[in-house]
Amino acid sequence: MAIEVDLSGRVALVTGSSRGLGRADALALARAGADVVLADIQLESEAGADEYGPLAQVAREQGLVYTEQTAEEIRGLGRRALAVRCDVTDRAQVEAAANSELGAADILEPN
């Protein structure tokens, strides 16, 4: 039996949303009706994220960064989405992402 959840009118902030579990969670929240802020240290269109170490560099080189693509998929579901670069170790960046142009976050999915 599937559990139905209506998150219409809610804003979710998902960190680590460029791939894997964070990306899957962001899409699931959007399917449940939430607008989503996708916060990740990497965006496809942005150079320079390699400074965050070898994992970031490998992910970019292998085309495994999907933050902006995920935002487009969420918009395709009829929800609002915003992809932002955010270092979750920097409190000011997280607070800025949580109070984005979509409004204050109602849901936080730390990944």
Feature locations, PLM:
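Short-chain dehydrogenase/reductase
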Residues: 1-104
